[in-house]
């Protein structure tokens, strides 16, 4: 099982070896580690938040944790954002991370285009943003609709965009349709189902993803939102156990809402795909 969504936060950090021991205890053998955030997201006293230092930190950490991929957190509006993309790519990151905390997504278009040209994936936050600013409105799903025209970009929207889960599903429907019509000229959108949905909303959100009638089987990625500093084994197990039961229910009755005339859905292996099989395509390693 892989975990798409693991953060590096300020403060004490487990060694890569201890981190690996904890992830293995949770049944997680690999995934993504998202590097420390820039000052424009939050200034941390005593932390070196210069982009070069943050880049080296996530590369060094993942270098000691085989199976885990380094993702660089970039502010797409930084004056030297394109230089950051170039340098991070040359140094070997596996992808990029963006949270739109003070800007609308479209303002970073040039940076996203540069990332698309590298062939590396881009992970976005989506949904309510728990910080000290009124910033959630920057992260509603339809604010990302323009990405449909960023040729070659593979991107994910996190947390099922809670509380705008239905809006996210409708956005995926549009982008999925366009990608099927012109696969060489459009972007590819993935669901990052990392919690953000509280447990009481979780089953409904996952059922909407799979049972709306869209081709989602190969576009869903599972994560926890744990931190690499001290990976929470109990928390990761909780979400894996809950989600596995929900997935079993979906697989047992996949055609409940199938429209007459549509092909029957085969959701027999959706859990294995979301927790492992879909990762390689997201990374660009088909």
Predicted regions and their residues:
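Mid-domain alpha/beta scaffold segments of enzyme catalytic cores
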Residues: 1-118, 192, 241, 268, ...
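Active-site metal-binding loops of divalent metal-dependent hydrolases
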Residues: 6-7, 76, 126-128, 160, ...
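H/E-rich (His + Asp/Glu) clusters that bind or coordinate divalent metals
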Residues: 13, 156, 160-286
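A general structural detector for well-ordered alpha-helical segments in enzyme core domains, enriched
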Residues: 18-22, 54-61, 84-88, 111, ...
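Structural detector of well-ordered beta-strand residues that form the stable sheet scaffold
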Residues: 32, 69-71, 123-125, 156, ...
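Short loop/turn segments at strand-loop or loop-helix junctions that form parts
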Residues: 33-38, 124-127, 225
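Short, flexible/disordered intra-domain loops and linkers
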Residues: 38-52, 130-138, 167-170, 202, ...
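Divalent metal-binding pocket/active-site signature
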Residues: 76-79, 90-177
């Amino acid at each position: 099982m892989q975990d798409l969504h693991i953060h590096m936060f300020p403060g004490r950090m487990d060694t890569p070896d201890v981190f690996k021991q904890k992830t293995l205890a949770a049944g997680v053998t690999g995934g993504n580690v998202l590097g420390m955030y820039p000052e424009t997201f939050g200034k941390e006293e005593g932390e070196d938040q210069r982009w070069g230092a943050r880049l080296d930190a996530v590369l060094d950490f993942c270098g000691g944790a085989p199976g885990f991929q380094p993702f660089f957190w970039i502010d797409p509006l930084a004056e030297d954002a394109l230089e950051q993309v170039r340098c991070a790519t040359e140094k070997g990151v596996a992808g990029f991370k963006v949270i739109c905390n003070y800007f609308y997504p479209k303002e970073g278009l040039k940076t996203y285009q540069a990332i698309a040209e590298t062939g590396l994936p881009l992970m976005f936050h989506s949904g309510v943003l728990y910080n000290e600013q009124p910033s959630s409105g920057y992260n509603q799903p339809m604010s990302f609709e323009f990405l449909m025209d960023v040729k070659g970009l593979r991107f994910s929207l996190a947390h099922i965009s809670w509380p705008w889960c239905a809006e996210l599903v409708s956005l995926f429907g549009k982008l999925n349709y366009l990608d099927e019509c012109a696969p060489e000229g459009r972007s590819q959108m993935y669901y990052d189902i990392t919690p953000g949905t509280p447990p009481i909303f979780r089953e409904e959100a996952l059922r909407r993803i799979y049972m709306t009638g869209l081709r989602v089987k190969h576009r869903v990625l599972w994560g926890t939102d744990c931190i690499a500093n001290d990976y929470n084994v109990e928390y990761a197990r909780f979400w894996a156990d809950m989600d596995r039961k929900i997935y079993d229910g979906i697989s047992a009755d996949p055609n409940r809402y199938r429209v007459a005339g549509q092909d029957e859905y085969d959701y027999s292996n959706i859990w294995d795909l979301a927790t492992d099989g879909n990762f390689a395509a997201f990374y660009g390693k088909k």
